[in-house]
């Protein structure tokens, strides 16, 4: 077998253009959703949303904070769609308010009728924007029908089956069988970067993350990859440590 020829790395000097996330749909495919009773479904989503924040406030008041560890000023929320339906993922994000889509994925679930595709999304919501989603629910339930007979935020609300806290495995994008358990494993961490170009990559963001890793006794490599809006580094952690990272 001939040896693989080696080439120099490609260096792209021109800053890239940032394009916002949009759901991938087949041409002409209809958005699949499940009809809902507005009052009942709105009440369910509101109760789940309020329960998430009540638990968050309780945990913040009782959990021991690690000295010198920077406090997280928001939570990660996991939105789950209905089986074999679409989740209106692009409407979950509002960057102007700091509400950021972090992960979108499709899982398979099984029941007595067979296997079903379930769309999921993880969104970061700042503490001071916790009422933003409640306002969307309120508009959905209380709005008057449009000329087409639809209601405000109807497509978004009807696409959501349930809302819960996002745990570390909600952020895992690799194979499920590769997830760390009790034994620490090397894995990539993609850190959000508020800057929009590689040149302006937020090194302080990574430095702060490494400080958190040190406080939690999590090993890491010093090499960093900078991309627009994301910084990538390697850490060696188990499931418990990954959850601690998300909690802090």
Task: Describe each region flagged by the PLM.
Residues 1-212, 248:
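Autoinhibitory N-terminal propeptides
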Residues 225-231, 236, 240-248:
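Protease zymogen maturation seam
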Residues 203, 222-224:
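Short acidic alpha-helix initiation/capping motifs at coil-to-helix transition points
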Residues 216-220:
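Beta-strand-enriched, solvent-exposed domains that form extended recognition/catalytic surfaces
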